[in-house]
Amino acid sequence: MKYLSIFLALFLIVSCKQKEKETDALGVVNISVTGNKNALPHFKKGLLLLHSFEYEDAREAFQKAKKEDPEMAMAYWGEAMTYNHSLWQEQDYVDAAIVLEQLDEINSQQETTELENDLIEAVHILYKPKTEKKERDIGYSEFMESLYKKYPANQEVAAFYALSLLGSVEEGRDDVIYGKGAKIAKGILKENPNHPGALHYLIHSYDDPNHASLALDAANAYSKVAPDASHALHMPSHIYVAMGMWDDVISSNIASYQASLNRMEKKNLDNDSRGYHAFHWLEYGYLQKGNQEEAKKMVLDMKKYAAETPSKKARVHVVFLKGTYLTETDEWDGEIANIPVDITDLNISVRSQYHFLEGMKAFKEGNISKLDSVLNTMEQDHKRESFVVAEGSSKLCSAVTRDEATEMDLKESEIRQNQLMALRAELNNDLKLAEEHFIKSIDIENSLSFSYGPPSIQKPPHELYADWLLTQNRNEEAAEHYSLALKNGPGRLRILKGIENTKQVI
């Protein structure tokens, strides 16, 4: 009996550890914080989830830590951090400010370490009152740099400094700053190869075709290190898309989307908890493999989800999936092309994507009046939003969301307008004007930094121009522009087919 009791005790310990591993496989972080023993596991889980951008679940974990220890200062720090989504252009200033007020009330009575006090000061800079968001982001990053120098061996300080660098770039990419972030992330990984933040931020730092191969090892590792974070299962596909690794894009996003469904069922959530982002990338992967049947089913499923829960998030993704399907398949006369979407309250970039699809459909049908109507709507929309952006928005003490127009949104919209204007000119047999608009769309694209993932400009400018050049029997020029398109979209099926067509037509 004695040996049996020992065996049972060991079995229970192993079983508990296995269960913990299965449910909380989120990576490894090393940080000591002040708090009671019941609060610490919740804090650690929140920190791990925070590094994988699982903001809602991270917030829930930090709130549990607060409940276990209402005077645990770092639990308030963590919750406040969940309201800043630096790489998604989102910030909930008001809710963060409420948490920081609570923190200020308890922090004066609570003994905290010097490191904790420094991190608390950092988060106050991130939400500094009466200060524009851009200024706050830069100030926060500069302060994190000072902490990085002060605590050179602290992996968490390094990780959040790396992220702050990426977040200090207001729009697009800055290779110098992103390279600096990558260097810091790689330094962490040398000491802790299972750090979820370092893996995650390294992938973001190298998320373009020119650098993607430098993060391939991190991409392959991240989903294994943090498989219980849906976003960690998706993130490797950023590198896989940039390298044209379509089978891996598909497998990554199947896993990520399924993880979101598991969470949805576990927490009894609505359709908005579905991983629509991964769902869109999965559709794109299928289309690059020529699996149009599965992709079409996904668009129809997305239509159904949006009908059941007609949120902004759902409607945005109907536009995304519809647009990706149509531009990749050219099925402008099918049922997908006729799916309506209420875009009135969406970002101008999404609205212009939808208008582009309507314009392309009109062009394919030779419906000049419809195309003119679409172009007029786009022009008025662009003027109105340009005025709003020119007036500026101080972002002193308000939420920042993706609904608000940015300079990049306006330029992307202008690209789509010029593409449709080129096609309109072709319908009018004005080939010179058509070419001018095609070239202008390319020039605008060249002024922007690389946009990762499925193309935001659904029909990339070099690719659409090359398609048009083929119709003009200018095959060598078409081949040149297909090659240029391939640099931004390695392995894209329509580009590869276009290159083959230039050879056949000659």
Where are these regions (language model features)?
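TPR repeat positional signature
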Residues: 42, 76, 83, 118, ...
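C-terminal motif of bacterial Sec signal peptides marking the signal peptidase cleavage site
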Residues: 14-15
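Structural register within alpha-helical repeat arrays
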Residues: 38, 45, 79, 121, ...
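Solenoid-like repeat scaffolds
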Residues: 66-68, 148-150, 189-191, 221-228, ...
